[in-house]
């Protein structure tokens, strides 16, 4: 055994072991092992959109607990790390960091700067993820913007085109005027805004005044109809008539439709193209004309005498209201709060514009996707309802076109040849990856085609994150079909709950469309990390925790301990108290191991090398046997919890056993036998030391998935093993090990010890204070247990009296 160091220096040791683990490649995936023996993880690729925060550490380490356990029970592990480094989030980071805009410096220059920023940020990400001891195989790393990922993403696009699941259409889409791009339904958030409900006078052709309430009077030039509910008796007489819009004098039909809310406003609603999704429905259902007045920049495009042309939306609204007031057409205004659809990232209110975009069919697959959600194993189970609610709420097909620069291009051109103008030309699979701005379709020259200038939604690539690692999409579209078949579907998708509607949903959708399957067997959903006061962390509040500072203060194992104390899926507040508990646990492990180390030289080498089951008969003491039985129960319970992804329960059971059973009781009770300074009980001494040896070894293995550095250090010191504690097949397994003993005896002794300890505490006596006599009734302990009790309580004499079955004690000091 190595000499036991005086103190544990977590800073030095964590760096040391991280280096050794990488050098020895103990986390390497073996492609020669079968899929059945491999545990395959679809690791969340962190978005390169800013600094990694404590929430990332929180969720990534929770995944690592499960992965390390699976490796230790003998599984070959496929655990990659990726970086989601394309799309709007990354562009926004670059624009903020470099104080530039893509449209000011040109597409190519902007992409070059994005690539430079991404490379720098990813190096920082790697450093932090290594510091928190993620057991990923870095040789499997991928970037969503790499040529390989672009090829796979474009293969996904072409496969879905071939299957008829992707289409291009000129139809209404959600538009973010700040970021200048189309968005999908999942990219929006409902924001409560204060606004004014404006009651405006319209007139029928016959001159009958009608009042219509609207929050968006600037859309009056785009009004194409006025609607009322077919059951509304106030307006039934208007059927078939026309109304004249104020200011702009347009003649529009009065129509009945059941979607009108009779109790909202006046019961009359103007339909404009477009103010909301109901407008789109009415426009389609009633075959109404299209009037487009809002530009991509969020300004009005409507030259007229009113003077709203080129004004921003809010400016045009104010101008229209002023004119309505001047002409006595504004009856009243009411202050209201209502929900406005905004872009999740820019926060800008969205507009609905009509333009050609690419869409993935989604609405037609809702029923099938609900079935998929039910087939998936959810951890925790209550997260499934979030996906079900989202699927039920879907009302748009997935728009995957983005009018940005730094993303995966569509492998598409549009023909300019005479006779086939506008024909869509797709890249050949052998050409991928392609950039239509640089490359050409087979058989066409530059002047014969128009490239598709858009890039794909970043989720269009992230949604094939399993396939970015497997290198295949389907039977017809695969770079390495054998690799793909060996890795897909995967075993686990870990992710946060707020992206169930995006990442989880889109990945399930793609796998369903490509191969009629789920992408993984299990999904493990983490909660949020909150500030200590349980508020959401934000830079504006100044309560964001920087992982590097916490690592410097506490070390990786303590942070991982804090993460392990949170149940899966629960939102958890950062806690200094839990961190301090973790620090105490590290120290306690160190000190317990130091005590064990003192005695190990007394063991025979052959007994050290043997498995616990093989030395079962050498453990002769009754309390040692009880301890081994309890240890086996613990191993079985912890194994069961980890197999069910309940890492918090596993950690709690292990910690409780270590502190309460092993440290507080077993170490104290067996200590005298272990030392045996008078050589009175050599077999009892050997039994206790062998028990200490194996219990400590097992506990280190149970703690190893959670606290990898301290367990590795102690494992190497105590057991001088040439192999890491973290390699495949090292988890504790004591099957078929059990001693047939009367457990009531040992448990009775512990009850007596507890009573004695409380007595000494109440009398302010030292725990080692001598006792003249212990008179015990209700139980008669065996000679071995009585001797252990005598030693641990410092009792000179113990007398047993049988009176009844209830344990009672008289203590004479």
Curated annotation (Swiss-Prot):
Catalyzed chemical reaction(s): tRNA(Val) + L-valine + ATP = L-valyl-tRNA(Val) + AMP + diphosphate
Single GO MF descriptor: valine-tRNA ligase activity
Motif mapping: 'KMSKS' region: 536-540
UniProt keyword annotation of Transcription present: no
UniProt motif 'HIGH' region: location: 46-56
GO biological process: valyl-tRNA aminoacylation
Domain notes: ValRS has two distinct active sites: one for aminoacylation and one for editing. The misactivated threonine is translocated from the active site to the editing site.
HAMAP family for the chain: Val_tRNA_synth_type2
Protein's UniProt name: Valine--tRNA ligase
Species this chain originates from: Rickettsia canadensis (strain McKiel)
């Amino acid at each position: 055994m190595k000499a036991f160091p005086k103190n544990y220096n977590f800073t030095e040791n964590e760096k040391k072991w991280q280096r050794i683990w990488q050098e020895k490649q103990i986390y390497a995936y073996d492609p020669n092992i079968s899929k059945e023996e491999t545990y395959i993880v679809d690791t969340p690729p962190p978005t390169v959109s800013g600094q990694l925060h404590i929430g990332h550490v929180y969720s990534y380490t929770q995944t690592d607990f499960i992965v390390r356990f699976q490796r230790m029970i003998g599984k070959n592990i496929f655990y990659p790390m990726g970086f989601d480094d394309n799309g709007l989030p990354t562009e926004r980071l670059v624009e903020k960091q470099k104080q530039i805009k893509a449209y000011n410096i040109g597409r190519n220059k902007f992409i070059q700067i994005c690539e430079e920023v991404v490379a720098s940020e990813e190096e920082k990400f790697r450093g932090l993820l290594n510091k928190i001891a993620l057991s990923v195989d870095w040789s499997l790393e991928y970037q969503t913007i790499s040529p390989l990922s672009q090829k796979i993403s474009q293969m996904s696009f072409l496969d879905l085109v071939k299957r008829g699941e992707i289409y291009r259409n000129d139809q209404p889409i959600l538009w973010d005027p700040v970021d200048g791009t189309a968005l999908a339904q999942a990219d929006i958030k409902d924001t409560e805004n204060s606004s004014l409900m404006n009651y405006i006078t319209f007139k029928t052709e016959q001159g009958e005044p009608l009042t219509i309430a609207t929050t968006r009077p600037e859309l009056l030039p785009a009004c194409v109809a006025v609607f009322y509910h077919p059951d509304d008796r106030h307006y039934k007489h208007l059927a078939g008539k026309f109304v004249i819009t104020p200011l702009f004098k347009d003649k529009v039909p009065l129509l009945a439709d059941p979607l009108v809310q009779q109790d909202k406003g006046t019961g009359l609603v103007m339909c404009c193209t477009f103010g909301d999704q109901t407008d789109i429905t009415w426009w389609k259902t009633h075959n109404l004309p299209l009037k487009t007045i809002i530009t991509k920049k969020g300004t009005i495009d409507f030259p007229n005498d009113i003077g709203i042309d080129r004004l921003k939306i809010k400016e045009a609204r104010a101008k229209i209201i002023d004119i309505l007031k001047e002409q006595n057409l504004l009856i009243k205004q009411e202050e209201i709060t209502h929900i406005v659809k905004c872009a999740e990232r820019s926060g800008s209110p969205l507009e609905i514009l009509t333009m050609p975009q690419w869409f993935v069919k989604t609405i037609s697959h809702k029923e099938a996707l609900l079935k998929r959600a039910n087939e998936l194993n959810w951890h925790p189970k209550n997260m499934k309802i979030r996906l079900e609610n989202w699927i039920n709420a879907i009302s748009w097909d997935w728009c995957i076109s983005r009018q940005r620069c730094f993303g995966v291009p569509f492998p598409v051109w549009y023909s300019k040849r005479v006779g086939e103008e506008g024909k869509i030309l797709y890249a050949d699979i052998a050409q991928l990856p392609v950039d239509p701005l640089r490359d050409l379709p087979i058989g066409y020259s530059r002047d014969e085609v128009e490239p598709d200038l858009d890039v794909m939604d970043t989720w269009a690539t992230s949604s094939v994150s399993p396939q970015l690692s497997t290198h295949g999409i389907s039977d017809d579209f695969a770079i390495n079909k054998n690799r793909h078949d060996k890795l897909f579907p995967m075993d686990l998708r870990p992710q946060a709950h707020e992206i169930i509607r995006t990442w989880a949903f889109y990945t399930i959708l793609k796998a369903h469309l490509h191969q009629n399957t789920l992408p993984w067997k299990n999904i493990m959903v983490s909660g949020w990390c909150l500030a200590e006061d349980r508020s959401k962390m934000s830079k504006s509040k100044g309560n964001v925790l920087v992982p590097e500072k916490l690592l410097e203060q506490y070390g990786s194992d303590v942070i991982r301990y804090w993460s392990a104390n949170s149940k899966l899926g629960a939102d958890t507040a950062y806690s200094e108290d839990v961190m301090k508990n973790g620090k105490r646990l590290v120290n306690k492990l160190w000190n317990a191991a130091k005590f064990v180390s003192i005695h190990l030289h007394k063991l025979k080498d052959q007994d050290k090398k043997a498995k616990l089951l093989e030395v079962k008969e050498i453990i002769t003491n009754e309390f040692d046997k009880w301890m081994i039985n309890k240890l086996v129960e613990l191993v079985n319970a912890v194994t069961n919890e980890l197999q069910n992804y309940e890492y918090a329960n596993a950690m709690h059971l292990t910690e409780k056993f270590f502190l309460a059973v092993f440290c507080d009781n077993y170490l104290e009770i067996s200590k005298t036998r272990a030392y045996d300074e008078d050589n009175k009980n050599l077999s009892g001494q050997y039994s206790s030391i062998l028990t200490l040896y194996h219990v400590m070894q097992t506990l280190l293995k149970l703690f190893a998935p959670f606290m990898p550095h301290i367990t590795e250090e102690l494992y190497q010191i105590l057991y001088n093993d040439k192999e890491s504690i973290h390699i495949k097949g090292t988890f504790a397994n004591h099957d078929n090990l059990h001693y047939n003993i009367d457990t009531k005896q040992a448990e009775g002794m512990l009850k007596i010890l507890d009573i004695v300890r409380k007595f000494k505490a109440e009398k302010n006596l030292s725990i080692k204070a001598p006792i003249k006599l212990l008179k015990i009734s209700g139980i008669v302990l065996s000679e071995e247990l009585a001797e252990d009790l005598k030693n641990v309580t410092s009792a000179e004499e113990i007398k047993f009296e049988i009176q009844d079955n209830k344990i009672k004690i008289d203590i004479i000091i």
